[in-house]
Amino acid sequence: MNLILYQRDDCHLCDLALDVLANARVPEFQSVFIDDDDKLETRFGERVPVLHDDETGRELDWPFDPVAVRNFLADTAIR
C-alpha cells in the first residue's frame, strides 16, 4: 500500500487530517503539497486534504476520522 496525503501549505484542515492519521496509527504515508502543481491543483483543488492509495487509486476525501481511515485501509488491503 502506497498512501499519499494531498494537502496545501497553511491549511488547517490538512493539519487536522495529519492528527487523524496519527490517531488512526497510519504507519507510513507521503505528504504531497498541491500548491505549486497545476495538474494536482486541477485534480484536487478544494478537496484537500485527500488520502490516496496510489496502488488502487482509491481516495478518502475530507472530512474523515480515525475510524473512517482504518476502514479505508482495511478495505484497500482486501482489494
Set out the residue ranges of the language-model regions.
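Local sequence-structure signature of Cys/Sec-based thiol-disulfide redox active-site neighborhoods
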Residues: 1-23
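Small/polar loops that bind or transfer phosphate-bearing groups
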Residues: 6, 32, 61
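Non-catalytic, surface beta->alpha helical segment in thiol-disulfide oxidoreductase systems
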Residues: 55-79
